[in-house]
């Protein structure tokens, strides 16, 4: 017998309301109603675990109730010695290492997932979980018809348990339907491999395109063009100077030739002077 504590229990809730609230989670051996809280006794430990996991925080008569396992009372000697674990039992690993595990651990989803298709709608997650337990395998989590109709997802603690359950359930006839099982174990290394590839490719994207890169030959040609530019300027200057010299030389040659000028008036006067003397008496 396993007892479960009910917190925030409405005062208007009756025994039938509580029994209806826990319907589908196994048989209840006793229901205890108090002022604002209560207790429920389950016959099976696994049914109590599932009820606490799924119904904690759900509404009962319009109020969200709290479901948890009551803590074990610690005696005076245990409290003095420090051996009161309050529901936690010590387990020992190889090598003598001690580890504390909660006896009432909640079902958890793991990466070892088994997908069961073609499941009858008459089978709930509790039914498929109990069916796997009858096969000698303990699942950690199960859900049915939640994501897809006629489909269940069951998780296990190890891949060996998953393989064992898959071999036993594959093709089994449940309520006129043959089950189809698929191993959907999540591999962490495979899920991370694309990220590593994308990271290795990222530096190439950040680099400049090859067209913008300059080869050593282009650098040399640029240097040659730059070094040749002063020569071109000097050639232009030399040509302009030669042209200016040729023009100036032509002008000087024209100025050296004596211009055709008329005789000066003095010479004309000298030629006319004897004529005037002979005519005088």
From Swiss-Prot:
InterPro entries: Nucleotide-bd_a/b_plait_sf, RBD_domain_sf, RRM_dom, RRT5_SRSF_SR. The keyword Phosphoprotein applies. It comes from the Eukaryota. Extensively phosphorylated on serine residues in the RS domain. Residues 78-100, 168-281 are annotated as: Disordered. Plays a functionally redundant role in spermatogenesis and growth rate control. Required for the development of somatic gonad structures and for progression from larval stage to adulthood. This is Probable splicing factor, arginine/serine-rich 2. The lineage of its organism: Eukaryota, Metazoa, Ecdysozoa, Nematoda, Chromadorea. The gene is rsp-2.
């Amino acid at each position: 017998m396993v007892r479960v504590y009910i917190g925030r229990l409405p005062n208007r809730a009756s025994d039938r309301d509580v029994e209806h609230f826990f319907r589908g989670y196994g048989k209840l051996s006793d229901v205890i109603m108090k002022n604002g809280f209560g207790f429920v006794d389950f016959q099976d430990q696994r049914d109590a675990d599932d009820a606490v996991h799924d119904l904690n925080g759900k509404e009962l008569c319009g109020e969200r109730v709290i479901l948890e396992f009551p803590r074990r009372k610690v005696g005076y000697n245990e409290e003095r010695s420090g051996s009161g674990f309050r529901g936690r039992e010590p387990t020992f690993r190889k090598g003598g290492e001690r580890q504390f595990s909660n006896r009432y651990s909640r079902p958890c989803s793991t990466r070892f997932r088994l997908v069961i298709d073609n499941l009858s709608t008459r089978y709930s997650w509790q039914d498929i979980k109990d069916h796997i337990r009858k096969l000698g395998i303990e699942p950690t989590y199960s859900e049915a018809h939640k994501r897809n109709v006629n489909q269940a997802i069951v998780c296990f603690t190890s891949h060996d348990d998953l393989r064992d359950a898959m071999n036993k359930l594959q093709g089994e006839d449940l309520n006129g339907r043959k089950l189809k099982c698929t191993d959907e174990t999540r591999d962490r290394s495979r899920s991370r491999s694309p990220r590593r590839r994308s990271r290795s490719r990222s530096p190439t994207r950040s680099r400049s395109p090859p067209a913008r890169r300059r080869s050593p030959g282009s650098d040399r040609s640029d240097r040659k063009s730059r070094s040749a530019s002063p020569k071109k300027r000097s050639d232009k200057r030399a040509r302009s100077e030669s042209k200016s010299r040729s023009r100036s030389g032509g002008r000087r040659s024209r100025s050296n030739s004596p211009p055709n000028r008329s005789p000066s008036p003095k010479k004309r006067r000298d030629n006319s002077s004897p004529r005037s003397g002979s005519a005088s008496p």
